[in-house]
């Protein structure tokens, strides 16, 4: 064996350096005189170091009382610690869906086209966690079966970074957890990145040297007391709300793929603004037809576009004996000056067609209207053909931005918007129902108004907010968006009428196409072709993408994935369930290859009345009180049929406004107000009873008594919860 290293080993005395001889430190030059109070001179002891003991003194002055009291509570006999661990996409942003709310569109079913949205307002409750468990998106480490008590201890969330797309996140644990008109605008990256306590999730491209995830620890919500609650009470308590949006941290002030930050769009011209109604009666039908005949169809200058040939020529060639040259203006531009413009040179305000072209739209409208009626006879047909696709008042003949010459006027107006000049003061955004004839803002008729915010923030998540606020899931087809903005060129502002709004539309709608540029227009929509929110979303999307730090939809799909770990404790006094198997017919000593499954139960049905407890079991039998209680609550165990909800459960609620009194309607169901005395409320309701037949008055009184009964029962339940110690703050409810 080779023992040569023994001689080369480093002995302790050889390699240890020699201790430096102690010398007094050299005197330093005195520095300049200090203007503030001199520090206390520190006297250093020479020689061996000795520990110093200071005298005990009270810290912080005199003794004060505790800021928090420790309230003790009896623990249940059986406690299990449970972690709910799962994965989910917090945001799935398809192409050009940056301004949409993914929480609202997470359950959409689309055959083609972009999916999702670029922002989200996602809430988490115990019911939502169980819903995710049923979708096989999480697992529970311990079952909650027969354990009717629960404690929430917090959660941990991991955000996984995207390779190329950045995100901004803000977590809220303080109620109220409701959407208002400024919630979605505050989530725009330009607004959210200026707020406090935001979390940046940079892409791997933006910050390549860091971890591929961002971990966040979130505690229990504010106003939440840490104690044992029934699971049925904690089922709908909002635990936290996450606001998140995609952003661009590399190019925050415009995409490098464009040379202009301004947004161009069109608004309806002057002939439309007093005649915007779509549901017309017999008298209104005649008025509208005469108005548009004189102010739209008789204007030859509106036909100077290639869309005239595309919409009118095919039917003319197929149904009439006239050729297309019969409608073309043959006069050429000459050097002889005249008082009228009669030539066909559109570069100098000439007209490409003669007066006979104004008769064609009426023929084309009636032909296609009749063809559509024969194609879908079961559909409800409109009362007029003014909204026909090919030659109606919103046809591409009048609204397409491509004219024969770029200065040729149309039935629209071009608007330029610069997001960096928009101060927000004076801006108004609202929606009007399609049954409204004008675009003037009205506090009673107009809905979902947003005031004094930049357009790039006001349009962010606006369509989803309108849908939740009005309760109309088809809001995009039943309303139109109006806007007033003095920061455009020209200004969208009428100084004579400050409440006047303007209706904009997308480039594809003006060209007679669907959103996204598809030429395949459904036959029902060709029957009712008019401006609505569905055809305005592209302009709203473009304006939102022009704002600071906005995501520019460079990817077909961008996903922000998260992993969550909710910390719970289940407790209760269940009956001991002992399973005895036959010892001879059992399995072998080796374990089962199938992983052990944990059966989670809907927290809604894990309540005091629906669970057997140890005190219900006496001498091997169930007691009479327990059997009677379970028989009374047997209706709650009936499973309802599976149906698709109208809105995803994870989406936040909208703050409800006080309902207006309507003397013609029946008694309105309103929320329970505990601060109002029942006698006072009954007196107010009796005063609202209108005069009428005795039978109607008795029916209204019966409805009032039923409503009063429900309110008294809810008050009694709340008082009982307070006495039991199970009461929760009202703002913590997901419906609050």
UniProtKB/Swiss-Prot annotation:
Pfam families the record matches: TT_ORF1
Predominant location: virion
Superkingdom per UniProt: Viruses
Protein location: Virion
Keywords linked to the UniProt accession: Capsid protein, T=1 icosahedral capsid protein, Virion
Biased composition range(s): Basic and acidic residues: 650-664
InterPro entries cross-referenced by the UniProt entry: TTvirus_Unk (IPR004219)
Region (Disordered): 633-692
Cellular-component GO terms for this entry: T=1 icosahedral viral capsid
Function: Self assemble to form an icosahedral capsid.
Family classification: Belongs to the anelloviridae capsid protein family.
Protein name, UniProt field: Capsid protein
Lineage, top ranks: Viruses, Viruses incertae sedis, Anelloviridae, Alphatorquevirus, Alphatorquevirus homin3
């Amino acid at each position: 064996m080779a023992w040569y290293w023994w001689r080369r080993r480093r002995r302790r005395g050889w390699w240890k350096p020699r201790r430096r001889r102690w010398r007094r430190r050299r005197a330093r030059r005195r520095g300049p005189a200090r203007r503030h109070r001199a520090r206390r001179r520190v006297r250093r002891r020479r020689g061996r170091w000795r520990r110093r003991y200071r005298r005990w003194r009270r810290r912080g002055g005199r003794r004060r009382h505790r800021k928090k009291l420790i309230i003790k509570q009896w623990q249940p006999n059986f406690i299990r610690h449970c972690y709910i661990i799962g994965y989910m996409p917090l945001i799935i942003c398809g192409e050009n869906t940056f301004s949409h709310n993914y929480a609202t569109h997470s359950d959409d079913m689309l055959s083609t086209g972009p999916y999702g949205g670029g922002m989200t307002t996602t809430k988490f409750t115990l019911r939502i966690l169980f819903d995710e468990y049923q979708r096989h998106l999480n697992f529970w480490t311990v079952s909650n079966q027969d354990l009717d008590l629960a404690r929430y201890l917090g959660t941990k969330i991991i955000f996984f970074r995207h390779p190329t797309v950045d995100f901004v996140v803000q977590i809220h644990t303080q109620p109220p957890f409701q959407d208002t008109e400024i919630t979605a605008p505050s989530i725009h990256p330009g607004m959210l990145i200026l707020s406090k306590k935001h979390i940046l999730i940079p892409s791997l491209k933006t910050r390549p040297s860091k971890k591929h995830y961002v971990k966040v620890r979130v505690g229990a919500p504010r106003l939440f007391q840490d104690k044992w609650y029934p699971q049925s009470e904690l089922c709908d308590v909002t635990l936290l709300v996450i606001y998140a949006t995609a952003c661009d941290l590399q190019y925050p002030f415009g995409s490098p793929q464009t040379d202009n930050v301004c947004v161009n769009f069109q608004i309806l011209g002057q002939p439309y603004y007093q005649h915007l109604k779509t549901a017309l009666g017999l008298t209104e039908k005649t008025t509208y037809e005469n108005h548009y005949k004189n102010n739209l169809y008789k204007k030859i200058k509106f036909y100077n576009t290639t869309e005239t040939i595309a919409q009118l020529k095919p039917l003319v060639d197929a149904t009439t004996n006239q050729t297309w040259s019969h409608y073309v203006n043959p006069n050429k531009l000459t050097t002889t000056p005249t008082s009228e413009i009669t030539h066909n040179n559109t570069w100098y305000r000439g007209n490409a067609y003669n007066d006979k072209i104004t008769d064609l739209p009426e023929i084309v409208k009636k032909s296609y209207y009749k063809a559509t009626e024969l194609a879908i006879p079961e559909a409800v047909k409109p009362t007029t053909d003014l909204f026909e696709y090919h030659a109606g008042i919103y046809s591409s003949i009048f609204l397409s931005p491509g004219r024969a010459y770029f200065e040729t006027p149309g039935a629209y107006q071009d608007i330029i918007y610069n997001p960096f000049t928009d101060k927000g003061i004076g801006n108004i955004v609202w929606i009007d129902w399609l049954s409204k004839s004008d675009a003037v803002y009205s506090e009673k008729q107009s809905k979902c108004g947003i005031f004094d915010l930049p357009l790039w923030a006001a349009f962010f998540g606006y369509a989803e907010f309108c849908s939740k606020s009005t309760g109309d899931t088809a809001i995009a087809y039943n309303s139109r968006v109006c806007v007033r903005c003095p920061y455009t060129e020209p200004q969208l502002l009428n100084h004579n009428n400050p409440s006047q709004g303007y209706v904009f539309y997308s480039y594809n709608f003006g060209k007679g196409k669907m959103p996204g540029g598809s030429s395949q227009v459904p036959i029902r929509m060709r029957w009712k072709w008019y401006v609505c929110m569905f055809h305005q979303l592209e302009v709203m999307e473009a304006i939102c993408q022009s704002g600071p730090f906005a995501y520019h939809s460079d990817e077909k799909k961008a996903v922000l994935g998260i992993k969550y770990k909710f910390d719970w404790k289940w407790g209760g006094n269940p009956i001991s369930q002992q399973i005895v198997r036959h010892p001879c017919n059992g399995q072998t000593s080796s374990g089962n290859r199938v992983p052990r499954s944990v059966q989670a139960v809907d927290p809604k049905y894990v309540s005091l009345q629906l669970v057997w407890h140890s005190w219900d079991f006496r001498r091997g039998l169930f007691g009479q009180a327990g059997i009677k209680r379970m028989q009374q609550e047997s209706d709650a165990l009936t499973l309802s049929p599976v149906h698709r909800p109208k809105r995803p459960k994870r989406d936040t609620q909208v703050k409800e406004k006080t309902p207006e009194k309507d003397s013609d309607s029946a008694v309105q169901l309103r929320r329970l107000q505990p601060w109002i005395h029942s006698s006072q409320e009954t007196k107010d309701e009796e005063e609202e009873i209108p005069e009428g037949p005795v039978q109607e008055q008795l029916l209204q009184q019966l409805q009032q008594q039923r409503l009063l009964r429900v309110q008294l029962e809810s008050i009694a339940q709340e008082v009982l919860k307070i006495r039991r110690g199970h009461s929760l703050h009202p703002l913590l409810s997901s419906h609050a």
